Amino acid sequence: MKTRAGRIATALWLLATSLWAYWGAGEYFFEAYGVRGVPGWAYFVPAAALGLLGALALIRPRWGGILLAVAGLGFTAWWWGRMAARGLFDLQRALGTAPVSLALALVGGLWWLEGRAPGPRSARRFWALAVPAAVVLATALYYLPYVTGRTPAGTGPWRAATAVGVLEWAPAGPGWNLRLGPRYPSWAELAAYGRAPRGFAEKPGPYDPEREGLCAYLDPSGTRLGAEPVGVWRLPTRAELVAALVRGGKLAGCRYRADAPRADCARVPNKEGPLWDPAAPAVYYWTAEATPTGEVWYVPYTGGLRYGGRIAHQPADWGNPRHGYRCVRRLR
């Protein structure tokens, strides 16, 4: 680049693209690696789009800068409009997203200024394109030893003597990540399953998952839902889920400290059988526990340790493929 504006624009673009590359690769390996039907390429779209716009700006700074500015302003308008349509738009949220969205317009303006400088530019500027690719490669090298060779899931129940007691987890069927057509049930739908009219629908709180929840309607075998509550199965607590986390198909030696965002484990847990299905989209399991504000706790397969996720809470009506469940019963 020939001007200070061009050098600043290149540095900012490189930082943004590298961060998106790191986020995309990390989220892909944490959420989507080995999962059936998940388009892994979608995780890399933001970084790829920024990379293409940056490549154009390195070749033709003026035109690339204009496109980046238009993309930044357009994305900002779309994002703010989306928040407004959901009733979530306010000054705090607008300012919180501005560094991500409006920064593109700033970088575009700086590259446009660079484009006004006459004369040839050094070919060394294209080395910047290799940095995001190197970030993806480094992230892959970090994750691949962790995500490959996972123990597959079985279809039957799983019984384990954990630090909090002997637990039995429901087999494949309605007690383990039931799918509702193209979507998955929210915690609120699971917790109010038995409330009239019985079935999956968003029903207002308060919730009593132990009496009205889907798990309470499972028969003793855990394979069928009955017309009346049986009371054999239930959603687990955080302590029970953490104690049952696995690595290499065996218990990972984890314990839970109250309200901590991560577990204390002898080994970093993994998304594998017999507790998890590595080919299914769920990377978190719901618990039966709620906060005083009505949000519900969940536990990631990592136990909140270094490969991603944390023990946290979400609104009860939150439902997506990454938040699953598995019913449990304590044997002793």
Where are these regions (language model features)?
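Short, structured beta-strand segments at or near domain termini in extracellular proteins/domains
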Residues: 286, 312-332
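Internal/C-terminal transmembrane anchor helices
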Residues: 122-148
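Short aromatic-cysteine micro-motif
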Residues: 155-234, 238-252
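Juxtamembrane "helix-exit" motif on the non-cytosolic side of transmembrane helices
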Residues: 23-33, 77-89, 145-147
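Cytosolic-side transmembrane helix boundary signature
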Residues: 106-132
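Alpha-helical transmembrane segments of polytopic membrane proteins
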Residues: 36-51, 79, 91-105
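An exposed tryptophan-centered "aromatic clamp" motif
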Residues: 212-232, 238-303
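Aromatic-anchored segments of alpha-helical transmembrane domains
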Residues: 16-23, 69-83, 136-143
